[in-house]
């Protein structure tokens, strides 16, 4: 991965930041992207302070003109773009009959349309290079249903389909496209959701883990962001050149049941 250039969206924190860090640790030049400029700059600065080659480019992944501009800037500055990680995501939970249509459409836009737009604009560069690694962060919710997550599940199922099409179109040009499907991961977003649930149920945080999450996960634990990042590194590596069009599951056994 040394001397390669990687763009990671939604990289100001959580899984995205850890993926950016692990890519940088492997020697890649990393472009940290996020909708929030200050958080984006802070994340890139943190990586730079750790001695890594990192730059911040904040932009809205749903705005095609901004995506095109970002890809052009990267191409001009680095002369190449080897790795794309589509990680940006948002969440909303509600029964179908109570789910606001505009919220549903926004989730689809961020987590399905945005990866399509990004792939659309990096494919020409990767085809010209005859090399590319695209990793779409999907979810176990892209493989199974989950009540209350109609938009999230629809987007994640869709991005797995997009991944397969991208893999077929990219294969003749040295481009691999895969989807990572994490289960429950120890991120701030998940911790906030569990904290809200503990308040709603008036039970301790650990009780929420024991009563709600662990019955679903045979390993009885949350995955770490580094576990997800390590697998992203593998998929971007030469060792995984034969892996493409796959929905790779890391879920502590959740979908084995």
From Swiss-Prot:
Its EC number is 1.-.-.-. The keyword NAD applies. The keyword Nucleotide-binding does not apply. Keywords: NAD, Oxidoreductase. One of its GO terms (molecular function) is oxidoreductase activity, acting on the CH-OH group of donors, NAD or NADP as acceptor. The active site is at 152 (proton acceptor). Pfam families: adh_short. It comes from the Bacteria. SMART domains: PKS_KR. GO terms for biological process: fatty acid biosynthetic process. InterPro entries: 3-OHbutyrate_DH, NAD(P)-bd_dom_sf, Sc_DH/Rdtase_CS, SDR, SDR_fam. NAD(+) binds at residues 34, 60-61, 87, 152, 156. Belongs to the short-chain dehydrogenases/reductases (SDR) family. This is Uncharacterized oxidoreductase YxjF. It comes from Bacillus subtilis (strain 168). The gene is yxjF.
